[in-house]
Design a protein with these regions (language model features):
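Transmembrane helix-boundary motif of multi-pass solute transporters/channels
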Residues: 17-53, 64, 70-88
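Short, non-helical or kinked segments that cap or interrupt transmembrane helices
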Residues: 68-81, 121-129, 172, 246-251, ...
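C-terminal ends of transmembrane helices
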Residues: 2-5, 57-70, 107-119, 160-167, ...
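Membrane-embedded alpha-helical modules
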Residues: 91-194, 298-390
Length: 390
């Protein structure tokens, strides 16, 4: 059966959008899950967070694509979730973390609405921001090898699958590793006699009343805002521009900021412009340039469909051998770690400030109940101003 050129023009962007959603979710949900659990979420609250975020940016992707006719795709903040892992529990527990998520959303919306604030964020030196991110990512990226020592029979196949897939089909490396991890979880559960909690397979939105504490605002909201802007929104906009599209910056950033504030009480930490998966819907594989907005719309619909899997992935994580989910999360972030290290140490002149920022962020120490990322940023800026004046 033959297809008309018109059919092909529709099929190509629709398929690209579906791939965008599938890769976007499967390649990073483990990081988000680890981040939410690290700051105090129960399994049900973590599932609610995954569901709220996926529904939230799914709806916003469709709206932005239809209004602007540009292949804008959104995502959760994967580096932001890594930040949550490195921060851990804060004073006030999960409700305080949720309060920090609300503040993060409002700050992002304010940055999008006020050009001067956006310019201020953009002035944070690249090497300092990248060094802070690299320090945040380091412990997560070490996790696969720690897990390998603890459970080699389960973790080794995951790492091998990731390496082989990285050689053959890099885009699918993490989904393939995840598939192998699911197989390992099933084998482990059958040996131990554990079974999935069927009641938790259907995800539900769970409301958490936010509380606000200064340690959570300073230790989570401020670094999360900076990481999300510097590592997601700015690179995401750059990807779209690289394909010749005009970026609807204000509407994208304001809507994702307000969207974050809305989904935060349900466990969502931050949503933003997609960076890692942005090229899937904006590139040539998504069809003729004037139809690539359809790929974004398709991605939004895909995310709405995939959102229903939030309960399943959390239930699987609950019966997983220790370390296997963290191993998948770490493998998913290795590329981001390498890129951030390259950005941090690209210029010899700034390596001292970048190095100290990286080491402090990687240390994970908490001062005055505020996590390492905030202090690493301050230290890096202070050292840069002191040692590297023009």
């Amino acid at each position: 059966m033959s297809h008309s050129p018109t059919d092909a023009h529709w099929q190509q962007p629709v398929t690209a959008g579906a791939v965008t959603a599938l890769v976007g979710f499967t390649s990073s949900f483990a990081v988000v899950l680890a981040g939410l659990r690290a700051v105090g979420a129960t399994p049900a609250q973590a599932a609610s967070g995954l569901l709220a975020l996926t529904l939230g940016f799914g709806v916003l992707i469709i709206a932005l694509a239809l209004v602007h006719r540009v292949p804008v795709t959104l995502a959760w903040s994967t580096p932001g979730a890594a930040l949550l892992v490195s921060t851990g529990s804060v004073e006030g527990g999960w409700p305080a973390a949720v309060g920090a998520f609300v503040v993060t959303g409002l700050l992002i919306a304010l940055i999008g609405a006020v050009p001067a604030l956006g310019a201020l964020v953009a002035r944070i030196p690249t090497e300092i921001a990248q060094a802070m991110l690299a320090g945040i990512l380091l412990q997560l990226c070490i996790a696969p090898f720690v897990a390998l020592a603890d459970a080699p029979g389960y973790v080794a196949p995951v790492i091998v699958a990731w390496v082989v897939a990285s050689r053959i089909a890099p885009r699918w490396a993490v989904p393939v590793a995840l598939l192998v991890a699911v197989g390992a979880i099933v084998v482990a559960a059958s040996r131990s006699g554990e079974s999935l909690d069927t009641a938790s397979l259907v995800p539900r939105l769970e409301w958490t009343t936010p509380t606000w504490t200064w340690p959570a605002i300073v230790g989570i909201a401020l670094p999360l805002t900076i990481v999300t802007m510097a590592s997601q929104n700015l690179p995401g906009a750059a990807v779209l521009r690289s394909f010749g599209f005009s970026v609807p910056w204000r509407s994208s950033v304001v809507s994702t900021g307000l969207g974050t504030a809305v989904v935060a009480p349900f466990g969502g930490h931050a949503m933003n412009l997609a960076a890692l998966s942005a090229a899937l819907a904006a590139g040539e594989e998504a069809g003729p340039r004037e139809r690539r907005w359809i790929a974004a719309t398709s991605a939004g619909v895909g995310y709405l469909v995939i959102a229903g899997a939030a309960g399943l992935v959390v239930a699987l994580a609950d019966v997983a051998p220790p370390g296997i989910i963290e191993a998948v999360a770490g493998l998913a972030l290795i590329g981001a770690l390498v890129a951030s290290l390259q950005g941090a140490f690209a210029h010899e002149r700034h390596r001292t400030s970048a190095g100290l920022t990286f080491l402090f962020a990687a240390s994970g120490v908490s001062l005055l109940s505020v996590g390492a990322a905030f202090w690493a940023l301050l230290l890096g800026l202070a050292v840069r101003a002191t040692l590297e004046r023009d």
